[in-house]
């Protein structure tokens, strides 16, 4: 598939999960705090919310800076969130999408599962694991 006359995009995908010692309500609410994304998603430098379902994220990948408009596509409270980048002037030749799921555990913990698909390059699997570890540290203190 060619996009804007560029070479075909290579898509990378990865999935990871982690158990966090906090209730699903607390974990979900913390993930919804978009302004905290740079604290655990190291590729995001800052986030600006546009409306209830859209925000612009300033990203840094492989020594390059991008701004990407993201759309929240699915929001099932305390269960699942899904988002994707929109094709726009910010990053016309790149695409990313993600789904994060929250599963309550019997010991008041929460299993967080993150799936990412990206054309921004780099090792998506190592980023997923790192983002989850960072998020766990942020939530658990």
Task: Walk through the language-model features, giving the residues of each.
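Hydrophobic ligand-binding cavity/cleft-lining segments
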Residues: 2-56, 134, 138-140
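Beta-strand/loop substructures that line and gate deep hydrophobic ligand-binding cavities in soluble
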Residues: 5-8, 66-74, 82-141
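Residue-level marker for the onset of beta-strands and adjacent loop->beta junctions
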Residues: 14, 43, 55, 68-69, ...
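Short beta-strand-to-loop capping motifs
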Residues: 20-22, 59, 116-118
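Short strand-connecting beta-turns/loops that link adjacent beta-strands
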Residues: 23, 52, 77, 105-108
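Alpha-helix boundary recognition
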Residues: 32, 73-76
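Short, hydrophobic/aromatic-rich segments at coil-to-beta transitions
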Residues: 49-56, 76-84
């Amino acid at each position: 598939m060619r996009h804007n006359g560029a070479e075909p995009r290579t898509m990378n995908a990865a999935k990871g999960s982690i158990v966090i010692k906090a209730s699903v309500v607390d974990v979900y609410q913390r993930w919804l705090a978009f302004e905290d994304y740079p604290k655990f998603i190291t590729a995001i430098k800052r986030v600006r919310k546009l409306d209830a379902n859209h925000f612009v994220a300033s990203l840094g990948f492989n020594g390059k800076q991008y701004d990407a408009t993201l759309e929240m596509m699915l929001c099932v409270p305390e269960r699942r969130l899904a988002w994707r980048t929109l094709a726009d002037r910010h990053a016309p030749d790149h695409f990313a999408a993600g789904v994060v799921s929250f599963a309550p555990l019997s010991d008041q913990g929460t299993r967080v599962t993150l799936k990412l698909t990206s054309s921004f390059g780099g090792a998506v699997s190592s980023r997923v694991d790192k983002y989850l570890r960072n998020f766990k540290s942020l939530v658990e203190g």
